């Protein structure tokens, strides 16, 4: 009986490891140091990657954003949050503000409203 319990425990540990590995394989495709935005929910459709500010989202992304990921690098004095504005040239309301490492697969209030973004020290 003790041997069966040990085998079951080992099997559960192995299964947990496999599940963790599977989850890592499905991570959002956005390079380290970048803010990424997609035209469809769940990180699908056309993707644009930004390592800096963009005060004028091009026509194929302007007001077409549906999912977002902030893979910016954090550190002392580093602007690592991303503020998304509904107008170009950082005008209008902030539709979203993403903290470092934050990924949003869909947000109905911000969907198709982005026009520009800037890196900031905080939200």
Where are each of the predicted segments found?
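Compact beta-sheet-dominated domain cores in extracellular/mature segments
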Residues: 2-9, 14-17, 21-123
């Amino acid at each position: 009986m003790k041997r069966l319990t040990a085998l079951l425990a080992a099997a559960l540990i192995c299964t947990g490891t496999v599940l963790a590995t599977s989850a890592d394989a499905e991570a959002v495709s956005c390079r380290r140091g970048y803010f990424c935005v997609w035209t469809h929910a769940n990180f699908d459709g056309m993707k644009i990657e930004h390592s800096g500010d963009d005060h004028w989202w091009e026509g194929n992304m302007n007001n077409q954003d549906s999912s977002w990921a902030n893979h910016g690098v954090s550190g002392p004095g580093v602007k690592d949050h991303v503020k998304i504005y509904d107008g170009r040239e950082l005008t209008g309301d902030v539709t979203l503000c993403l903290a470092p490492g934050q990924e949003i697969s869909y947000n109905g209030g911000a969907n198709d409203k982005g026009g520009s973004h800037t890196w900031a020290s905080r939200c």
